[in-house]
Amino acid sequence: MLIRKTNSMIVSMGPHHPSMHGVLRLIITLDGENVIDCEPVLGYLHRGMEKIAENRTIIQYLPYVTRWDYLATMFTEAITINAPEKLANIQVPKRASYIRVIMLELSRIASHLLWLGPFMADIGAQTPFFYILREREMIYDLFESATGMRMMHNYFRIGGVAVDLPYGWIDKCLDFCEYFLPKVNEYENLITQNPIFLKRVEGIGVINKEEAINWGLSGPMLRASGMEWDLRKVDHYECYDELDWSVQWEKRGDCLARYIVRVGEMRESVKIIQQALKAIPGGPYENLEARKLNTKKSTQWNDFEYQFISKKSSPTFKIPKQEHYVRLEASKGELGIFLIGDDNIFPWRWKIRPPGFINLQVLPPLVNGMKLADIMTILGSIDIIMGEVDR
C-alpha cells in the first residue's frame, strides 16, 4: 500500500469573507481538512476610540460609542454614562433606572436574535435568519418610537435618560413581550432537535470551566462552560435586584451549550422587561441635580453676535481627579471602562475592555485539531462584532 505524505497548506480566510462577522482575517494552516494552526489578524476596523475619548466631553463622545458594538448600542451608551456617574457619585432617579433596564434588555434580545440568524446561516440553515428579522424589526420599532433612532440611539444621559417614554409605549412593549415568548419556543422547535444542527454543534469547540476562567472569558461564553456568573447579579447595578430572574448557564462548554444559554437569556430578558414595565415608578427621568456639575458658560455666548450663529453649549461635566473601573453585562460579555479623571471636562485616560476582543483570543485553541468547516461554527458561537474588537 502506497502512503503519500501531504504537505500543510496555509489558507487566508477574510477579511472579506461573508462568515467572518466583520473585517476579520484568519490565517489557517491545514493538513487536508484538519486545522493545525489558526492566527487571527485584527485591526482592520481600528479607529482610535480610546484616544478620541481623551479630547471629547462625555456628551460629545456619546455618538462615537454606539459605533463599537453597533448591534447592541444601548450597552455601550450605558457604560459610557455609568463611568462618570460612579466617579462623581451622581444618583440616578428610580424611573430612569427602570427605563435603562428595559432598554438594555430589549437591546440584549435584538443582539441575540441577530446572533442566532447568521449563526444558523453559517452552519447551513437559512430559514431561521428570516424568522429572527421579523421580531428584531419590532424591537427596532420600539427603539424608534422611544428614542427617535432605530440604531445609534444616543438615549442615555449622565443622571438619567434623554427623554421620557412616550404615551402608549409601555402597552406597546408589553404586547411585544406577549408576542415574542411563543416565537422563542418556535425557534427551539425548529432548531434544537434538528439532527443536522446537532451534528454540527454538539461536542464542537469545547472549553471547560477552568480554561474559560483562565482565558478571561465572559458572558455566554463563560456561562456555557459551567460558571454561573452574571454581572447583573454580581454587581447589583441599576434595579436588577428588584426583579425576579435567573442566570442561564450550561456545563458542556460546546457550541450547543452557547446556543442554549443565549436562547434562555432571551426568555429571561422578556421576563425582566415585563416586570420592569409593570413596576416602573413615576417621577423624573433625569437627575437635575447633576446639572450642578455643569461648568460655567462663557459670558460671550450671550452676546449679540452669538444669537445669529445658534451657539448653544452642551452640558459639560468636570470629571473628578480619581480613577474607577466600571463594568456591565453586555450581550456578548463583560463590557468595562477604566476611567481616569484629572479634574477636567475631558477624561485623562479612557480604557475600553470589550468582551468580543477577549473572547476572540480563545479561537485558535478551540479550532486546533478540528475540521475546516468547524471554524465557522466555533467563530459564530463566540459572537463577535469587529467594531468593538478593533475599537
Swiss-Prot record:
Keywords: Chloroplast, Membrane, NAD, NADP, Plastid, Plastoquinone, Quinone, Thylakoid, Translocase, Transport. The keyword Glycoprotein does not apply. InterPro entries: NADH_Q_OxRdtase_suD, NADH_UbQ_OxRdtase_49kDa_CS, NDH1_su_D/H, NiFe-Hase_large. GO terms for molecular function: NAD binding; oxidoreductase activity, acting on NAD(P)H, quinone or similar compound as acceptor; quinone binding. Gene3D superfamilies: Cytochrome-c3 Hydrogenase, chain B (1.10.645.10). Signal peptide: none annotated. It is found in: Plastid, Chloroplast thylakoid membrane. Pfam families: Complex1_49kDa (PF00346). It is a peripheral membrane protein. NDH is composed of at least 16 different subunits, 5 of which are encoded in the nucleus. This is NAD(P)H-quinone oxidoreductase subunit H, chloroplastic. The gene is ndhH.
